[in-house]
Amino acid sequence: SDIRLKAYRFSISWPRIFPNGKGKFNKKGVDFYSKLLDELLKKNIKPFITLYHWDLPQKIQNSGGWSNREITKYFTDYSYLIAKKFGDRCKNFITLNEPAVFSTFGYLDGYMAPGLKNKKKYLSCIHNINLAHGFAFKSIKSVSSNIKVGCTLNMAPSLAFSNSNKDINAKITYDTFWNRAYADPMYLGSYPKIIEDKIQNLIKENDMKIINQKNDFIGLNHYQHIRVISDKKNLLGARSVNLKELSKKININKNLTTMNWEIVPDAYYCQIMELKNRYNNPNIHLTENGCSFSDKVNNNGKILDVKRINFLKKYLKAVHKAIKNGAKIKSYFVWSF
């Protein structure tokens, strides 16, 4: 409240509420978040709850995690409980944070938990995650129609690394799986054909109706655009470029954050406008944007955070430009590193 924040987005830990993923809930876990909500409201700070930000109960992971369709039932029960306990005080719920990240890096590339490189399980994840969102949406709305519900997606314009046909085709594939595997079914009611052809056997009757709810908003996380290169070793045949490859294209000393992410404000504007134009001009919450830079305390005991200030200025100008061009931006949340 001292820095006049109007809203605070936080994640609830599923294992903290249901240590086994299901069954009896943990009252101490519920009480912790209840106290947090009460304190936020005392300070007139609007809470935004994210139900899943990658911490999965181990017993559910032992049964296949997101690759097992049964997870949709457990996530629905968890979502319902949170809505019952907190829906009187929190009116903005985000079901899932960055499905493309935890599915791709967890089940296809093996960078994140559970560390798998399994294309079949990855494809199952896509459909199960979409279903989980749809079921959770319905369960939350059954508690109160006044609760606003959406999903936060990590999206970015994709660029082919070169003009070769291989890289151009790789870019199309990567862009489809990264940017549209979740947004299209959730907000348009259908999968892109390249994905539908691969998961048709997983889609049961009424699945698409469950997935395609009347979402109240889209949450957008954005940090950089993506340069895509063809790679036969990757299970999709496409991947984002590494730092060595990137250095051949740009001056990495001037155009990267300390996490080696490109600084391209125009990409932010383009992604916001893509949401506006492709998904029928939805309400958009900009749920994450920010940068990582080294902080140094000077002789006066201050941090002259010039790079971060300049980054935020440029990206907020991109947001303002999108608003002037009709995008319905409802909030902007800085992600601090």
Q: Model-flagged regions — what are they?
A:
Residues 20, 30, 34-337:
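Active-site region of glycoside hydrolase catalytic domains
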Residues 1-33:
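Active-site-adjacent substrate/metal-binding segments within catalytic domains
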